[in-house]
């Protein structure tokens, strides 16, 4: 499989303070990579570099000419009083090369319907975005990330605002999407993502790539990504310990 994006010896940061140092990562077609690491370890910085939102200090980035990225950020803000319908929020995710300001064609409207059915909100097509819960809005923003048919989907803590009743369905949907595209999934919940991703990248100043989804305490400790147990109800989850430094 060909690489969609290849990062070589990337160093990046802010105001000349290095957050990532000598990072190497190759994302192939149909990869499903879980990105883990402590707060301040550089996960967000890595995403910014991949999304061209931050120029690295050094290193090179090679992108396949066919690369199309769909991005679901951790926090999506929208004025719930703004008079926009669900279908129009989704259509706003079209790439500028498709002239998103033009009236959408029949095939694009059909795609909206297919995506809404895919996430279980088929009856909300013409609803105002303000009528939706936070979790439902997150699902709509996922559709927005998918409307342009990306071959790389980037998700930053996608279950943050998703309804708990839909969380399991979300991960099943991502498994289906992985048949069509590569996925980068950022999460603090090691136990959850290790059961679904194919490989793991631990980001903590550098990037340590683990070519498997089998994550043990020993692996995380060797990569300087310590974990701790937290309780969600009666179920313990393995998550990364909090680091206060950037």
Show which residues each predicted segment covers.
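Conserved ABC ATPase "signature" region
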Residues: 105-124
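Catalytic Walker B motif of ABC-type/P-loop ATPase nucleotide-binding domains
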Residues: 153-157
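Conserved ABC ATPase signature
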Residues: 128-132, 136
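ABC ATPase nucleotide-binding domains
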Residues: 214-246
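Hydrophobic anchor residue at the start of the ABC signature
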Residues: 142-143, 170
């Amino acid at each position: 499989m060909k690489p969609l994006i290849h990062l070589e010896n990337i160093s990046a940061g802010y105001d000349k303070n290095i957050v990532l140092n000598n990072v190497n990562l190759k994302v192939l077609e149909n990869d499903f990579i879980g990105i883990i690491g402590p707060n301040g370890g550089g996960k967000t910085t890595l995403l910014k570099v991949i999304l061209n939102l931050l120029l690295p200090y050094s290193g090179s980035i090679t992108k396949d000419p066919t690369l199309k990225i769909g991005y679901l950020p951790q926090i999506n803000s929208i004025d719930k009083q703004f008079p926009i319908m669900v279908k129009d929020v989704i259509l706003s995710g079209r790439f500028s090369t498709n002239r998103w300001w033009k009236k959408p064609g029949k095939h694009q409207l059909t795609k909206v319907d297919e995506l809404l059915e895919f996430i279980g909100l088929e009856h909300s097509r013409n609803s105002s975005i303000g009528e939706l819960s936070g979790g439902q809005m997150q699902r709509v923003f996922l559709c927005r990330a998918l409307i342009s048919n990306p071959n790389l989907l980037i998700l930053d803590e996608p279950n943050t605002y998703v309804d708990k009743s839909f969380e399991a369905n979300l991960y099943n949907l991502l498994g289906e999407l992985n048949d069509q595209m590569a996925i980068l999934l950022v999460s603090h919940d090691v136990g959850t993502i290790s059961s679904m991703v194919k490989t793991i990248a631990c980001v903590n100043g550098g990037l340590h790539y683990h070519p498997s989804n089998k994550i043990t305490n020993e692996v995380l400790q060797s990569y300087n990504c310590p974990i701790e147990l937290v309780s969600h109800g009666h179920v313990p989850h393995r998550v990364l310990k909090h680091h206060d430094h950037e």
